[in-house]
Design a protein with these regions (language model features):
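Non-globular, low-confidence helical/coil segments that flank catalytic cores
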Residues: 4-45, 49-327
Length: 327
């Protein structure tokens, strides 16, 4: 609740121009004069501040603004920083679901939207310096997978929306499609395995589902492979173990440097066969409570495992030669 309220305030501040985003670092900066808004500030120069035990507090509006800016710029290891070159893959806080921001040489794509109405998701995109999305991929059709996408799409105006075929078109799915259809800037594309496109110098390929339909609709969700230079990452979305085995049987290339595990790292996915097929050096578990058995399976093949529960927002970066993780 508190995160959502803060996100709404932040989104509003960005829209009104009180918060500026540095496109190079993604760090926010505070401006007390909004875009097109005259903000009259009282004269604080003669105000006597109480003694805070030697703590230097600047007086005047400019001093307060400088202090606020220094506090923001002093944040170490800013988790939302996105490079303007290379490949950045960032897992965002997305409630019960998953949202992955992909930036390649200045081009942007969002995989999934997580649960909720999208205020927190949109705030994180703005914190990452993203004001526009080139593509959005709806990884599933349920509310936990795409709930936050309509608001993000309304503000970010993506050029493409790739969506899975769905047997059951629920409220979240219908709201997403309605939002996309109302936008004159967004082209809808039914995603099928084998579809491939370039995002900057990154090649994005839809590798799953290997077949449809399924008794368990989670296996109808999309899985994505991203190749950048000599490096690669798999984002498997919301499929479960049976869907992973179908990917293996389909003979699609699953070998990758990094793996964003399906189902956030729950026991229902990341089966032993998949772990052996991918053999990732890096594995990200985005669920709130990933299964210990999944961690063990990954560590046994030599993976460095990072969990949302421990690190929050997690980032992969590639220069085309090496993939590294920055939790």
């Amino acid at each position: 609740m508190l995160l959502g309220l803060c996100a709404l305030i932040f989104v509003g501040a960005c829209v009104l121009g009180f918060v500026k985003i540095d496109p190079q670092t993604g760090k926010p900066s505070l401006s007390l004069s909004g875009a097109g808004i005259d903000v009259s500030l009282p004269d604080l120069g003669n105000v006597s501040l109480p003694d805070f035990g030697g703590l230097a507090i600047p007086s005047g509006a400019e001093g307060l603004q400088d202090a606020a800016q220094k506090a923001i710029s002093g944040l170490s290891g800013w988790p939302y920083a996105v490079g303007q070159s290379g490949l950045t893959v960032k897992t965002l806080r997305a409630g019960k679901g998953e949202a992955v921001l992909v930036c390649a040489d200045g081009y942007t794509m969002l995989l999934g939207g997580g649960s909720g109405m999208g205020a927190a998701l949109t705030a994180q995109l703005l914190l990452s310096g993203v004001g526009h999305l080139n593509a959005v991929v709806a990884m599933g059709s349920d509310a936990d997978s795409i709930g936050g996408l309509p608001l993000a799409m309304t503000l970010m105006q993506p050029e493409y929306l790739l969506y899975p075929s769905s047997q059951t078109k629920g409220t979240a799915y219908n709201r997403l499609m309605d939002t996309a259809q109302k936008s004159s800037k967004t082209q809808l594309m039914a995603a099928k395995p084998g579809i491939s496109f370039m995002l900057g110098r990154a090649q994005v390929t839809i590798i799953g589902p290997a077949k449809t339909p399924h008794v368990d609709e989670r296996n109808d969700g999309l899985s994505v492979r991203i190749d950048y230079g000599q490096t690669s990452v798999l984002v498997l979305g919301g499929i479960i173990a049976s869907g992973e085995r179908e990917l293996i049987t389909s003979k699609v290339n699953l070998d990758a440097d990094a793996l964003v595990c399906a189902q956030g790292g729950s026991e229902e996915a990341t089966c032993q066969e998949l772990v052996e097929a991918v053999s990732p050096r890096i594995a990200l578990l985005t669920g709130k409570n990933p299964a210990n058995a999944v961690r063990v399976r990954l560590m046994r093949v030599g993976s460095d495992v990072y969990c949302r529960a421990d690190f929050g927002v997690m980032t992969l970066f590639s220069d085309g030669q090496t993939m590294t993780a920055k939790p």
